[in-house]
């Protein structure tokens, strides 16, 4: 089993089901591994920005880790605009970036670039694979990093020889980090604010905007009179008949000031103060 095959089985073990790909020659062993598998769906895109945008959308809507397969630094660069969006949305996305073989890097081929440097601005977690033997564990840790709640961008840079050399057995899924619970003191403070008679805004995002989350915040709003507002750019918002009304914060400051002019206090739920 070569590195690409063991890596793919490791990704499948971690719950990855779909790969949005725009590969080149450096990724052919990864393409071959996907082609042999009936557990990984591969979707070919003709532009890397489509790969990253589709991966972001899939991760948001399905709540599952999405996979991209991109060719070298230029391919990553073409995908970066939508990876920026995915990072801001905290979508669970794993990028597999092929690179020149370790022994070929020194020749500075035409498409050679600083892939690590290009990865940083659009990733929460970056790793450059050292060998075929470490690749399966690197892949398992990439999935683990991507699934840190509410989601992260994990980028794995894979030199071609690490994909085609003989490797070790696939790695089982690693434990996922549990959602951090609000501290008791923060809950007590929120309850006190909601009951002090002042006009309150609940600023919402992420888990607070799921169907279950909206049911809870609606109960709070009805009991306390709090106004419900969500971030201007929300990763996902459950909508439809029977759900509570949530205002989206205006993009321009003038709009937001009108929405917030009566507010005396604000409680952030799964988000941060508006910028």
Model regions and ranges:
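N-terminal alpha/beta PP-like core and its mobile active-site loop of ThDP/TPP-dependent enzymes
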Residues: 1-275
């Amino acid at each position: 089993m070569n590195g690409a095959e063991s890596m793919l089985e490791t990704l499948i073990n971690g719950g990855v089901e779909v790969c949005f790909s725009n590969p080149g020659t450096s990724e052919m062993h990864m393409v071959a591994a996907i082609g042999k598998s009936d557990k990984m769906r591969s979707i070919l895109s003709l532009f890397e920005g489509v790969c990253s945008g589709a991966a972001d959308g899939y991760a948001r809507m399905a709540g599952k880790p999405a996979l991209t397969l991109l060719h070298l630094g230029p391919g990553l660069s073409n995908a970066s605009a939508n990876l920026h969006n995915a990072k801001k949305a905290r979508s669970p996305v794993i990028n597999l970036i092929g690179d020149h073989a370790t022994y070929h890097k020194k020749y500075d081929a035409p498409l050679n670039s600083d892939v690590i440097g290009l990865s940083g601005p659009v990733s929460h977690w970056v790793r450059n694979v050292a060998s075929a033997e470490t690749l399966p564990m690197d892949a398992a840790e990439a999935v683990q990093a991507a699934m840190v709640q509410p989601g992260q961008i994990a980028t794995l840079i894979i030199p071609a020889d690490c994909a085609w050399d003989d490797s070790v057995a696939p790695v089982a899924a690693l434990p996922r980090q549990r959602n951090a619970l609000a501290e008791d003191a923060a809950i007590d403070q929120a309850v006190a604010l909601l009951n002090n008679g002042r006009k309150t805004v609940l600023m919402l995002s992420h888990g607070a905007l799921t169907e279950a989350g909206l049911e809870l915040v609606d109960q709070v709003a009805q009991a306390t009179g709090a106004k419900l507002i969500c971030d201007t750019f929300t990763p996902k918002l459950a909508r439809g008949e029977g759900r509570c009304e949530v205002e989206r914060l205006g993009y321009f400051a003038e709009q937001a000031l009108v929405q917030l002019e009566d507010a005396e206090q604000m409680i952030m739920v799964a988000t941060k103060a508006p910028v």
